[in-house]
């Protein structure tokens, strides 16, 4: 039983580290000269990881692609909130987290996460599950970008049944929502947790197909918008909207809570936060402006893959 558990951890880890390498290479190609700087970290008797951070790039103002593999004798509260019956189990967890904060306000911020947990007591049959997804946070909306993003996500999901995309799309809309602002963080994507409804091999295959689809979903958007002209107004709005990103990650994000409760490397956990941000109390967009359109047409629940988008 223990060998089977370790085999699962090893298999998932090999894929996630390879995905980390591919993602970093792809973004470095977009940058030209800037490179991710790698930091290896260890937690005594608790695992470790490799953090890769790119800062002050031409295209990417700050971006992180992190891999971690941690273990312990008790799951942090953030991981057992929905399953208190496993709160006393020892565990192993692996994950890849990506957040890219582009410099150009017309390029959306993007987030992706793929994770695997396995927990058990003694040699009992371990419980395992996958979680993750990806979501997009534009500052200025383009219909074609949103449709492309969601159509790639749907294509990846449809290999596992037509009900998967609507289910995980709805879960993403629900999760990435700022209740105190009464608004979504962005235009969504896919989100899932506790995925173990299929056998391990099929669940893992889903993770791999989703992970492999990420660059197809995001890179064309970055490539099409990274040279879009912008001025001080657009930059200020980007910094203002980044405040919502900070609020969500510090108030609601379960991955952030898990990492901090576990006692992981703080710098790696908080790499999701943008390098520059502003808050403007009581600010409202000018009616009819591009900024107003973001709220009216994009920060709403929509069926992005339909012809009408209604």
Curated annotation (Swiss-Prot):
Its main location: cytoplasm. Pathway: Porphyrin-containing compound metabolism; protoporphyrin-IX biosynthesis; protoporphyrinogen-IX from coproporphyrinogen-III (O2 route): step 1/1. A divalent metal cation binds at residues 101, 111, 150, 180. Keywords: Cytoplasm, Heme biosynthesis, Metal-binding, Oxidoreductase, Porphyrin biosynthesis. Its EC number is 1.3.3.3. The keyword Calcium does not apply. GO terms for cellular component: cytoplasm. Substrate binds at residues 97, 113-115, 263-265. SUPFAM superfamilies: Coproporphyrinogen III oxidase. HAMAP family: Coprogen_oxidas. Belongs to the aerobic coproporphyrinogen-III oxidase family. Homodimer. This is Oxygen-dependent coproporphyrinogen-III oxidase. It comes from Coxiella burnetii (strain Dugway 5J108-111). The gene is hemF.
């Amino acid at each position: 039983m223990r060998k089977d558990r370790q085999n699962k951890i090893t298999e998932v880890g090999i894929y996630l580290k390879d995905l980390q390498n591919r993602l970093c290479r792809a973004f470095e190609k977009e940058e030209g000269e800037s490179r991710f700087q790698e930091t290896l970290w260890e937690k005594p008797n608790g695992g470790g990881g490799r953090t890769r951070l790119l800062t002050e790039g031409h295209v990417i103002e700050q971006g992180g692609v992190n891999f971690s593999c941690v273990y312990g004798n008790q799951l942090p509260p953030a991981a057992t909130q929905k399953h208190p019956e496993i709160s006393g189990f020892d565990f192993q967890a692996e994950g890849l987290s990506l957040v890219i904060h582009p410099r150009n306000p017309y390029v959306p911020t993007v987030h992706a996460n793929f994770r695997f947990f396995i927990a058990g007591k003694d040699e009992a049959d371990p419980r395992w599950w996958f979680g993750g997804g990806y979501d997009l946070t534009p500052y200025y909306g383009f219909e074609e970008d949103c449709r492309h993003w969601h159509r790639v996500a749907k294509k990846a999901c449809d290999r596992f049944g037509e009900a998967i995309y609507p289910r995980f799309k709805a879960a993403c809309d629900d999760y990435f929502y700022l209740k105190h602002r009464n608004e979504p963080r962005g235009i969504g994507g896919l989100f899932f947790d506790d995925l173990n409804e299929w056998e391990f091999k099929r669940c893992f295959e889903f993770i791999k197909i989703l992970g492999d689809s990420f660059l197809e979903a995001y890179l064309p958007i970055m490539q099409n918008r990274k040279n879009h002209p912008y001025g001080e107004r657009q930059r200020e709005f980007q910094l203002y909207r980044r405040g919502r990103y900070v609020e969500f990650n510090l108030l609601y994000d379960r991955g952030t809570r898990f990492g901090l409760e576990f006692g992981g490397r703080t710098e790696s956990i908080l790499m999701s936060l943008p390098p520059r941000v502003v808050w403007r109390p009581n600010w409202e967009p000018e009616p009819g402006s591009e900024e107003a359109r973001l709220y009216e047409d994009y920060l709403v629940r929509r069926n992005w893959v339909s012809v009408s988008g209604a």
